[in-house]
Every structure is written in structure tokens, then in C-alpha cells.
Regions:
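Surface-exposed short loop/turn segments
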Residues: 24-42, 105-155, 170-171
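Short secondary-structure boundary motifs at beta->alpha junctions and helix caps
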Residues: 75-88, 156-194, 201
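Structured, soluble extracytoplasmic/luminal domains of envelope-associated proteins
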Residues: 83-107
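Sec-exported extracytoplasmic/periplasmic mature domains
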Residues: 100, 104-108, 193-201
Length: 203
């Protein structure tokens, strides 16, 4: 009879651990995960030379899976993460993947940036400043992207340009923000491809 309290405590402890584990699992599964969706129709062949795309440089707060928004009507200097929504990977990595796919779809050849520099003379470097959903009122927001692209040829700077795009969100939530940022990404990438085609880079 004296062992009953010990057995009871052990059972209670095991139940508590199982309950906490279930709560943790539920919390993880309640997270809604977003990416940038399917690629838009391919651009026409613009005759780009072979190039590599380096891993983007981003501010520390953008180097995460968090989906950020800003309430410009309340405090334009504060970025806030959505509680139950996140990206499938850091957003600028999603952008990098999309840029590479778009370069290839436009007739270019994307090489690995880890290869010998002599084998990859042209490298694109991306420095990101913003990738957020901006609310100008509680009912309306835009997906905003701001970044700088530099073209290097054998480590020599060839050209550099800043790109900034906004796209209106269809809904005032994370889903609307993800779609808006996808549209802003595609518009930015189209601008980048057009700019690259005008540089007359050597093939």
C-alpha cells in the first residue's frame, strides 16, 4: 500500500510529459508555412551569359524564417513578426532560388558560386534592405522589397543598381502579405533581368 503514492506520482508525471509533448506538437503544426509560389511564365530569351548568384547579404533580422510586417500608420520604425505564420526558408533565400530559376528560364546559364573564380567570371551579389509587408492602414498593405544588385567580373565591379518594388496585398494578413511579396519579387526579378540584358555583358 505504501508504494501506491509513488506509482501514482510516476503516472501523473508521465501524463504531464505526454500532455506537454502534445501541446508542443500542436503548436508546431499550427504554424502556417509560406513560400513564393509557382514561377510566373518564362521571360523571352534575353541572351544572358553564364553567371553565378552569390548568397544574399541580409540584415540579421531578415536572416530567419519569420514573416515580418510594419504598421507604418502607428510606428514606422518597428518591424513585427507574425505569430503563427513563417516562411519555408529565410525569404532572401527564396528570392535567390527564384532569381536563379528565372535567369535559367530566360535562356541564361546559372553556375555554382563555389566554383573556381576563373570558371565563373560573372557573379551577381545581392544586398537586401527590406522584405516586409507594410500596412499603411489596418485594412490595406503592400509587400515591399528593396535590394541592391552588384555585378562582378573576376572580382571587379562592373555595375550596380538598387531595385525597389511594391505590390498590393489582397488581404490584411500573412497570406495576403506572402502573395504580395511574391508579386513584388517577380516584378523585381523582371527589372533585374532587363537591366542585365542592357549591360551587354560578354558571353
Amino acid at each position: 500500500m505504501k508504494r501506491i503514492p509513488g506509482i501514482f506520482c510516476t503516472a501523473l508525471l508521465m501524463f504531464g510529459c505526454a500532455f506537454l509533448g502534445a501541446c508542443t506538437t500542436y503548436k508546431a503544426s499550427s504554424q502556417v508555412v509560406f513560400d513564393l509560389g509557382e514561377l510566373p511564365p518564362a521571360h523571352h530569351n534575353i541572351g544572358l551569359p553564364a553567371m553565378a548568384v552569390a548568397e544574399p547579404n541580409v540584415p540579421p533580422w531578415l536572416d530567419s524564417f519569420e514573416m515580418y510586417y510594419r504598421l507604418s500608420y502607428a510606428n514606422d520604425h518597428q518591424v513585427r513578426p507574425y505569430t503563427n505564420s513563417r516562411w519555408s526558408m529565410p525569404p532572401l533565400q527564396l528570392f535567390e532560388q527564384r532569381l536563379k530559376a528565372s535567369v535559367a528560364a530566360a535562356g541564361g546559364q546559372v553556375l555554382s558560386s563555389t566554383e573556381n573564380a576563373n570558371n565563373v567570371p560573372l557573379v551577381l551579389h545581392i544586398d537586401a534592405d527590406d522584405f516586409t509587408q507594410i500596412f499603411d492602414s489596418p485594412e490595406h498593405s503592400n509587400g515591399q522589397i528593396s535590394l541592391r544588385v552588384s555585378v562582378f567580373n573576376l572580382r571587379n565591379l562592373v555595375a550596380q543598381k538598387t531595385f525597389s518594388r511594391q505590390a498590393s496585398a489582397a488581404s490584411s494578413d500573412a497570406s495576403g502579405g506572402a502573395k504580395a511579396l511574391s508579386n513584388a519579387s517577380d516584378a523585381t526579378i523582371a527589372d533585374i533581368l532587363q537591366w542585365l540584358s542592357e549591360l551587354n555583358l560578354k558571353k
